Every structure is written in C-alpha cells, then in structure tokens.
Amino acid sequence: MSNKRTSVEQLISCPICSRKVFFSLINSHLDICGKEKSKPSSRPQTVSSLLAGPKKRKQANSEKFIDLENKDHEIKPGLKSESDDIEIVENESKRFKAAPSTDFAKSIVEPASSRDQLHNDYESRWLQKISHLPLSEKLRPKELRDYVGQQHILSQDNGTLFKYIKQGTIPSMILWGPPGVGKTSLARLLTKTATTSSNESNVGSRYFMIETSATKANTQELRGIFEKSKKEYQLTKRRTVLFIDEIHRFNKVQQDLLLPHVENGDIILIGATTENPSFQLNNALISRCLIFVLEKLNVNELCIVLSRGIALLNKCRKQVWNIENPLKLSRSILEYVVDLSVGDTRRALNMLEMIEVSTRERKADEEELSIDDVRDIIKNNSSNGLNTYYDPKGDNHYDTISAFHKSIRGGDENASLYYLARMLQGGEDPLYVARRMIRIASEDIGLRDSSLLPLAVAAHDAVMKVGLPEADLALAQCCVALARAPKSVELYRAWKKLRAMMSENMYSLASSEIPMHIRNAPTKLMEELGYHKGYKYNPDYIEGKVQQDYFPKEVLEKCPNKTDLKFLDGKHLGDKEDPDLRQSYQG
C-alpha cells in the first residue's frame, strides 16, 4: 500500500463488528469478520456481557513509562506508543478515530497477522500524514493525561485548574509562562476535556475553540468572532473559547474590546503570554480573568517528552523513511539536551530532531552516540551556541538587573559577575548595565568611596567607544570593584527623606521664600531691594566659620524639632543584626 497519499482516506463502520476500517480495506475485513461470525462462540455470552461494551481505557497512572531515575538507562527502539488509538485529523470539522487495540476489538477472533497488518496500515498512514510537521507538533498531546508538567495547577489533589475542568467548567484565564511550556496545548486540552466531562456528568457546558494570535488579529476579526460565538450558542448551546496567543501584543483598544464580551459570557477568554500580565494587560481585563503561572519543565519531565520523541522518530525511520537503524540515546545525553534547552520543550525537541537528522547515515555497527558527538552536532548546526530565554523588555530583564544590583549591594562579587554574564549573554543592552552601575556607585557606595563614581562613568564611556565584545571586561572590572567596595547609604537615605518631605511640602520646604541674604544681586536694583544684604562670605573668616542661617526663615519657624532638618545623620549603614548570620557563626 502506498504511503504517498494526497488526502486522508475515509473511515467507515463495519456492519458486523462496528469497527472503523479504511474504505479500501472494507472488503477484506468483511471476509474475515464473516468467517469468524459464523464460528460458534468459545464462551457463552450473557446479557450483561453484551451490554457492557468496550472497557474504558486504562488511566494515566497505569501507563508504564521509562524509568527515568535510572542514570544508565538507554532509550531503546520500538517503545510502546503513548496511546494505542490512532487519530487522524483532516480539519477542525472532521475527526476520524480507530481503536484496534481496545478490549472490545480484541474480543473478535481474528488472525494476529491480519490485525497487525491493519494496525500497521493505520499507523503508516498517520505517520505519513504528520511526517512533514516539526517534532514538537507531532508530539502535541491529544489527551490531558498525556500532558507533561504543570502539576501545581493540574494535580488531582490540589490543582485549581483541574477542579474546574473536572466539573466541565472553563473560566476565563491568562496562561503566563516562558516559551515551550505547553500554553497552547493546555488550552486545547482544557476545551476538549471540559466538554467531555460535561457530556459525561450532564453538568457544565459544551465548548468549541477558536484560535487566533495577537500578532495578526485586528478589531474587525474580533468582532466577527464575537458575532459567531453568539450564533453558535443560539444554535448549538456550545460556548466559545477564544484562545489568543501572545495576548500581550494587543494594544489598549483591542484589550478594551474584549471586556464586555468576557463580562457577559459571550466568550471564554484564554490568553497566552510570555510577559508579566500586570505590566502588559489592562487591570480591567486582568480582574475578569484568572492568572495561572506555568513553570519550566524539570529534567525528569523533559526526559519523558524526549523519550516519546525518540519513540516516534524511530517509527518514522522505519515506516516512512525506510531507515532500519534506530536512534539510541543514553540518559546522560538526554540530560545534556535538557540542560541546553533551558526548560523549553520546543527547543529540546528541535535539538533532538537535529540529532536524528545528523545520524541517519550512521551504520548499525558503529559505536553509540556519546555526549561529545552530540555536542559537536549541536555546535556545528548552531552558530549562536546556547541561547537562553532572555527578553530585554520582559520579566527577565527586570528580575536579572534586580538580582545584579542586590548582589553588588550585598558584597557578593561572584554572584554579581554571574548576573552580569547572564545579562550580556541574553542580549541585554550593555549601556543599560553601565548606567545601572553609575547609579549603584552613588546609591550603595556613596560617600564611603567617591572614586567609584568616576570608574562607573569610565565603564560607560568604554562601552560607548569600544562596544561589545571588547568592553565586556570594563563592565566586569567595574562590577567587581563595586561589589568589593565598602558600602554607605547615608546619602541615599538623606536624599530620599528630603524628597519625601518636599513632596508633602512639610514645614513649607517647597514653598518658602529664599532668604534675602543668600540671594544673588547681579543688578543695582536688586541690591537696593535687599538682595545679598548681610551675607557673610565664609572664606573671609577663620576656618570659614560664621553664625549664619541658610534655611528659609519660614521653615525654621515651622519646624519645632530642628533635627528633622538634619538629613545626613553620619551613619553609613543600619544597626540591625541578622539572626541567621549569628547562627552561622555559632555553627
């Protein structure tokens, strides 16, 4: 049978056994079913057995996964598929399903070779259909039980989101997390699972999903979706789940357009974003949605995904690409790929696909791949090396610069250097880092070592004149010098206190008149009006000391406690003692 089909062949029901069979195979299947139907049953059938029907598929916790805790484990070819069912999707309105391995199907006495042949035909057609897709798309889960990760919201014990979908309910929500953690897959599975739950329990609503992206959707398209959702509910009582990828790219007008339709239930909004919603989304929209934070997948979870990818690639090798030599990767190689992926499932699968393509011509008798082999493959096919997820305008930008500043303030020169390296590798603007170090020199070192401010300015000039990568050491030098320097926040606290008093016009600090004797008198008229009159020029006196007020008279009169005007208290640091530090000394 040819695997090169231009379209999906229709599945029809067998009139004898009710199984789904491809149209071209129905005649041979009827011959087998007819012969077996005429044979006497090997065991008596009761009414209850006839009514029982096919048994439910085993739950996810009964699946046998690879022992990923075994460090010496190797992924072997021919791993069991995550699901015996083969699902063929032509478009959103047509979905065909064949389940040749259910207990009900197995109860039909059929030669093993015929069953295997049918199963192989189904699988070959499915593999041929998806062979052009990226591996991440091939492995996209079809059932919620196949979804990997995010147990903090999907756990059956205390997962908030799981409680909703168990009741067949989907709330409007924002899925916030880094790339490659499964935001789109989760949204699709929520819609499917909630609809199934509501059908089984007769509680909740039925749903259908419309997907769009904020990078291409406009107000006209959104209005069309809202109108379609109303008509859909009137005709079928199905509620519309509107999934918007990269929702943070919507402007204020587009976000406001969503508000009334989310409010009155015309749509259920699921937005996916890699940016902090509190920075990028309107407060009104946030108040109408639940915020779920999706976390990066850990090593064990990513190894599960990679093992599934290897199993699928080996099937494609054998049945589509006619390559007999299977791909074998050890646990240590999987962990190496996981480390490079930085928690991004899509990136990990892309690297796995790169390894698979690069090893198709390897002979079966060659030595198994080592970490050095994989490192060379990735290095030769990636000009940029390791690319960590770092958005110069997103949360990582603010989180990393905050960690950098606090590490310098705490005097940890190694941590300071580490965060500097993370920012530069992630593509942060080096001038932004240099400007922050200028601020640190005044805020955290201040009067204890005034030479650090010119050093920070010099580092900024070095970046301006030389640029990266040559100026990286100038930034590192300034970073370490700031971390090692003695700290003083006397100036910072004094300035902060004064600004707070000025903002409230305390003691008329912001509105009082400047004293006449310390005003300038550049003209004769101003001199006649009393400007500069009575001013004592300090250099004319011994040690420059004179009795003279510099604060406005109104301020001095309104301030009963003159110590409030002493903004600089002479204390470089505070007087608190850290109990954790005391315990570490005692230990």
From Swiss-Prot:
It is found in: Nucleus. Keywords: ATP-binding, DNA damage, DNA repair, DNA-binding, Magnesium, Metal-binding, Nucleotide-binding, Nucleus, Zinc, Zinc-finger. The keyword Magnesium applies. Pfam families: AAA, AAA_assoc_2, MgsA_C. It comes from the Eukaryota. Its cofactor is Mg(2+). The keyword Ubl conjugation does not apply. One of its GO terms (molecular function) is enzyme activator activity. Belongs to the AAA ATPase family. RarA/MGS1/WRNIP1 subfamily. Involved in the maintenance of proper DNA topology and chromosome integrity via annealing of single-stranded DNA breaks. Modulates DNA polymerase delta during replication or replication-associated repair. May function as a modulator for SGS1 when DNA is damaged. Present with 1180 molecules/cell in log phase SD medium. This is DNA-dependent ATPase MGS1.
